[in-house]
């Protein structure tokens, strides 16, 4: 099993894969050792303070998850960057934001101390429009089920373009 890094930025348009990546992290650290924050209410300083805080119970590892980090301002990113220069050794910081770009200051800061995980839906053509039928085919394939392109396209037409809804239908 690979060693956990100090920080992860989990981003991308493939919301189900982002959710699965976060679940895998939580499973490795433990649900009881996980603290959730929202960037809409918590600043970068708040996130750093949560990482540095000692938990009520002594645990081997802690996970601090901050959702919606694409809403953070420059000062928040700087606070996290400062924290990541000397991160708490027993804490894993997971920053989640579907709109965070790979070349953003936040992604660069996390890349120095941890790992940037980008899960995007496949695109087609120059318009960067998501190729959802292809994505649906991949989802079925990952579950050991073969479907043709027409069936995948029909599912997208029936369910719509929400990847989370499509993933739910594939799981059925």
Question: Which positions does each model-derived feature cover?
Answer:
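Conserved beta/loop motifs at nucleotide-recognition and modification sites
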Residues: 1-172
């Amino acid at each position: 099993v690979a060693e956990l890094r100090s920080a992860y930025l989990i981003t991308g348009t493939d919301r189900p894969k982002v959710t699965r990546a976060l679940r895998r992290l939580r499973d490795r650290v433990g649900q009881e050792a996980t603290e959730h924050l929202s960037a809409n209410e918590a600043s970068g300083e708040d996130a750093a303070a949560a990482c540095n805080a000692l938990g009520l119970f002594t645990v081997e590892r802690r996970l601090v998850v901050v959702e919606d980090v694409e809403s953070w301002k420059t000062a928040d990113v700087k606070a996290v960057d400062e924290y990541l220069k000397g991160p708490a050794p027993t804490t894993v910081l997971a920053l989640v934001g579907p709109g965070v770009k790979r070349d953003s200051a936040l992604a660069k800061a996390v890349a120095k101390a941890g790992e940037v995980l980008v899960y995007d839906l496949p695109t087609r053509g120059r318009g960067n429009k998501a190729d959802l039928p292809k994505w649906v085919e991949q989802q079925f394939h990952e579950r050991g089920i073969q479907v043709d392109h027409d069936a995948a396209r029909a599912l997208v037409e029936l369910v719509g373009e929400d990847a989370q809804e499509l993933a739910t239908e594939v799981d059925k």
